[in-house]
From Swiss-Prot:
Residues 1-20 form the signal peptide. Its EC number is 3.2.1.n1, 3.2.1.22. It comes from Bacteroides fragilis (strain YCH46). This is Alpha-1,3-galactosidase A. It catalyses: Hydrolysis of terminal, non-reducing branched (1->3)-alpha-D-galactosidic residues, producing free D-galactose; Hydrolysis of terminal, non-reducing alpha-D-galactose residues in alpha-D-galactosides, including galactose oligosaccharides, galactomannans and galactolipids. The lineage of its organism: Bacteria, Pseudomonadati, Bacteroidota, Bacteroidia, Bacteroidales. Belongs to the glycosyl hydrolase 110 family. A subfamily. Keywords: Glycosidase, Hydrolase, Repeat, Signal. It is an enzyme of class 3 (hydrolase). InterPro entries: Beta-barrel_GLAA-B_II, Beta_helix, PbH1, Pectin_lyas_fold, Pectin_lyase_fold/virulence.
């Protein structure tokens, strides 16, 4: 008996030691990562991550400082990522991942304000099949961002002088300017011009003109071009130029669960931004997507900043800040695949249709799907997935638990994954300096967009689509609340109807008795706008626009030529009431098409 009594304390101590080890904090500096060394730390930080996985440590800590990460030694892995590149644009889907978290649970990465400074073209961090990962207080930037910035310095007929940002690398070869970076050259460029006087981001042909003109360097960072006499850009404006090929993404979260990014600052993202793909429960808390204040840069993302594709559970975006995107700051959607062939009574061959979205897992066993009529965007039947078989990067075979609807039209109708659709909350956030929309959201589950500011988004501040013939992204929405937001001078670049809020499904058959969207409420918002309409709504039932204030500004010239404040097309049971106009009172307030008078109730005369 005494022998066993001696063994018990030893067992307890072993258990306690093992349990304590699981709770230990792992420090990247213990693995050789040295802040401010300006040396490649990628293998050292990855070793610390791997140690957390091996031991079950709960915290990975980066002491404050700068840590440099190069492609050499980084993980290379093939990922098919939604909305990125076609087979022709980027034949290889292998990504260079700076830091890889694979099958890691319940880990907090504490950044302590540290900066990860990346080099070359890289996907900064990837989370694959993780659960309960939280990343706190970390800055991510690139030594040479893939976006270049060129400011017009002097402009005269026939000559244009520019200043290139200190982070923009260039060379002049045979009298023509070229942009390059660390291990890359910019070939197929897209250009957006920023006007500091109007704070607008507009599409520009300026780079096309400069790159075709003879150039000579007159001082480091200053280049003079012999440009056509009619080329007269505005001195002080800045061109933001980036390659259109989305060969990497800013940050990738794949098929994971319960992920939180908190006080993360993404100062530049190449390709596409933070992409969350088929992930459940994501919280973006005080995430800032914008250049470092001391960088002098305008651009923070080559395209979208937060992109959610096929996610489920809840997507929460709270107290975030977005400035400097060449596409949409927030985009939430699914992916519809087209029905190509009926293999048997319960099996369909489906195809990814859009060029830039294919190859990923779009359906999982047990998922509920809806069959979508492409012409009307109607969900006309449902089923449960029994099996999925990948045929190629573009083609999958899906077997269902019941017979395929006889009314399904092959090579036209689509299949939507209803399980992989999230609830969405976007609150207390700020959107600015983008040439496109502020928020795109399409999900059948509850959406709340509340207490945000949309400041001079180039197109509609909020766009709700639904399509099975363009991007093939999701079907109808059922429950959307847009409340307490402030919209300031949005849609100067256009969009559906040039509207501040646009509800624009892709259905070709417009019938108020067969609406696409339903139950969209727009309440207690303030619209400061230079143009109309404030709202464009197509094929929506149960549309409510109530107790909103509209203030007319003169920030930009009116561009739409539309005198109507509201433009409703094929809507049913629409209510517009309690609208307060300040400044100019419009002479014509509401335009309707493809709907009956009884389908609109309004207090506006």
């Amino acid at each position: 008996m005494k022998k066993y009594l001696h063994i018990l304390p030893a067992c307890f101590l072993f258990y306690a030691a093992a349990h304590a080890q699981q709770k230990d904090t792992v420090y990247v500096t213990d693995f050789g990562a040295v802040p401010y060394s300006y040396e490649n730390c990628v293998t050292q930080i990855q070793a610390a991550i791997d140690e957390c996985k091996r031991t079950g440590a709960k915290v990975l800590s980066l002491p404050e400082g700068r840590y440099d990460i190069w492609p050499e030694g980084a993980t290379r892995k093939e990922y098919y990522i939604s909305n990125t590149s076609t087979e022709q644009e980027c034949p290889s889907k292998v990504k260079t991942v700076g830091l890889m978290l694979h099958e890691i649970d319940d880990l907090t990465i504490e950044g302590n304000g540290a900066t990860l400074m990346y080099h070359g073209k890289m996907t900064t961090i990837a989370l694959e099949h993780c659960n309960g990962v939280r990343i706190n207080n970390l800055h991510i930037d690139f030594e040479r961002p893939a976006g270049s910035e060129i400011q017009y310095r002097k402009v005269t007929g026939g000559e244009t002088e520019v200043t290139l940002h200190r982070d923009t690398r260039y060379e002049i070869v045979n009298g023509k300017i070229r942009l390059y970076g660390e291990g890359w050259r910019s070939n197929k460029n897209h250009c957006i011009e920023y006007d500091p006087d109007t704070e607008s981001f507009t599409y520009s042909q300026g780079w096309n003109t400069l790159s075709a003109s003879d150039a000579r360097e007159i001082a480091p960072g200053i280049v003079r071009f012999n440009t056509p006499a009619e080329f007269m850009p505005k001195a002080g404006n800045t061109l933001t130029v980036r390659d259109i090929i989305r060969d990497q993404v800013g940050f990738f979260i794949l098929e994971s669960k319960n992920i939180t990014l908190s006080r993360l600052q993404m100062h530049y993202m190449h390709g596409l931004g933070i992409v969350s793909q088929y992930t459940e429960n994501i919280t973006m808390d005080r995430v800032k997507c914008a250049p470092r204040p001391d960088s002098g840069r305008l651009l923070a993302a080559s395209a979208d900043m937060m992109h959610f594709s096929g996610c489920k559970g809840k997507v929460i975006i709270d107290s975030c800040y977005f400035a400097g995107a060449q596409d949409d700051p927030v985009n939430v959607h699914g992916t519809n695949l087209r029905a190509l062939e009926k293999i048997d009574a319960q099996t369909l061959k489906l195809r990814f249709m859009h060029g830039q979205s294919y190859g990923f897992n779009a359906y999982f066993k047990g998922d509920t799907v809806a069959f979508i009529r492409a012409a009307t965007m109607e969900r006309f039947a449902s089923a449960t997935v029994r099996d999925v078989r990948r045929i190629s990067d573009r083609i999958v075979e899906v077997r269902f638990d019941r017979d395929i609807p006889t009314s399904l039209e092959l090579n036209h109708d689509c299949v939507e994954n209803m399980t992989c659709t999230p609830e969405v909350e976007i609150r207390n956030s700020y959107f600015t300096r983008t040439s496109t929309r502020g928020t795109l959201v399409t999900t059948p589950r509850k959406v709340v967009i509340e207490n945000n500011t949309y400041y001079k988004t180039g197109m509609s501040a909020i766009l709700i689509e639904a399509d099975a013939e363009g991007w093939y992204e999701s079907g109808p929405v059922k429950d959307v609340l847009i409340k307490g937001n402030t919209f300031i001078d949005c849609a100067y670049n256009g969009g559906p109807g040039h509207a501040v809020i646009a509800i624009h499904p892709s259905n070709k058959i417009i019938d108020a008795e067969r609406p696409v969207h339903q139950n969209i409420r727009i309440e207690d918002n303030t619209f400061r706008t230079f143009d109309y309409p404030v709202l464009y709504a197509k094929s929506t039932a149960g549309l409510l626009f109530r107790n909103n204030t509209i203030v007319r500004t003169e920030t930009f010239p009116a561009a739409s030529g539309n005198p109507y404040v509201f433009y409703l097309n094929g809507c049913k049971k629409a209510v517009i009431e309690g609208t307060v106009f300040k400044g100019e009172t419009p002479r014509q307030s509401i335009k309707t098409e493809n709907m009956k008078r009884k389908d609109l109730k309004t207090t506006i005369k």
